[in-house]
Amino acid sequence: MVIENRSLRTEPRGGVLLEWATMSVETPDMDELLRLVPTVGYGDDAPADRRGGALHLSAVLPALSAAIGHPAPTKVHADPKACQRALGLPDAESAIVVLVDGLGYWNLAMRLGHAPYLRSLMNESANQRPIATCAPSTTVAAMAAFGTGTCPGLTAMAGYTQLEPASHKLIQLIQFKDALAPKPANPHIPVPPMVDPLDLQREETVFEKLAAQEVRVTSSGLPKFSKSPLTEAALRGTDYQGNVTPRDRVLAAARASRTPGLTYLYIRDADKVGHNYGWDSEHWVAAFEHIDAQLALLKRSAPKGTLIVIVADHGMVQTDMDQRIDIAVEPQLTRGVSLVGGEPRSLMLYAEPDERPEDIACRWRDYLQDRALVRTKDEAIADGLFGPVCERVRPMLGDVVVQAAGAVTLVDSRTQGDKATHLPSVHGSQTALEMDIPCLIDMA
């Protein structure tokens, strides 16, 4: 497939070539985008393959702290100025960072004909390379890595669901609730968090580090996210400004940037619509066009000289129901497994007390073959999958970690409802389509 001069035509072979004005980006074909990529590392260098190190979601806030003149080092990014140089961020008194949930680099690239503002940014050579998100490539893990400038092995947020060791239950880390508990009779009565978010996620956020330096730090988002468990865990430390409409959230971010400091704006539509309808649906394209309009409004409304950086937490994969595997009906997969955490593209398996993780991993490898990468906890940690792992976090991680390749999904009908097992688009694994995210730089 070839995209030229803002038009689309199809070729029988090869990747996708995106061309407009002076810009040309070759997009691999879908088979290549759905292959597992090497595990990315953390640090302050820009690796030769341009994945990981300082070219990582976790490096964005440290880099921005340096760009606004208040470097905030973290445990995995000790040199914010090096991160700033690697990402190519200019100095500025005021900066806005926008995180568009679910807008992976290749999802963006393959739909740029619908996004005039984002297309204009992709004319710049500095914006034509993706950076990496964390593994697993999912919102809770990525938000915590982004907010703290660290990694899942330190934040204790390593999957959509994971083991809570004290109760030996699965905790769902969007709302910090018991993942397997029955739905409450009255859904309007809030369920208290299973664990205190500040106790689970103990790393200081970059926002907190900046606030301690008396730097203005503002968040603009939906009112309901102001004190949510995920915000408290991963993104605490800002003056949160809640507004109902997207336009008001954008304008609030622009107003805040009149004062030197850092502003964070969250846009969730690409992920939400992708899960409900699929990222290749007309609904997703409409949401994408709306996102582009919001970002263009931000550019027009922000004070001149404001640095604008646009990133995402992960990309999205269109599911193939023919490649869907239900663990519940495969005895080889359920044997020896007490709990199944994670999500359909990235599972964490917790072994029964007398079961060896190596034996579980062997059975899963035999069954899945090249449809997934199966590692024991020790192997995954040694590979650097979660970044540096502290001893407190280690028991929370699965005894076996499984990451799907291709369009494979791994579901469990014993504990998941029909909607959860049939999501049109998902994420979480270690493919380029999920791991590669944009880092688009603009100046108002």
Residue map of PLM features:
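N-terminal start and proteolytic maturation junction detector
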Residues: 9-10
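Feature captures the catalytic ectodomains and active-site-proximal regions of enzymes
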Residues: 13-444
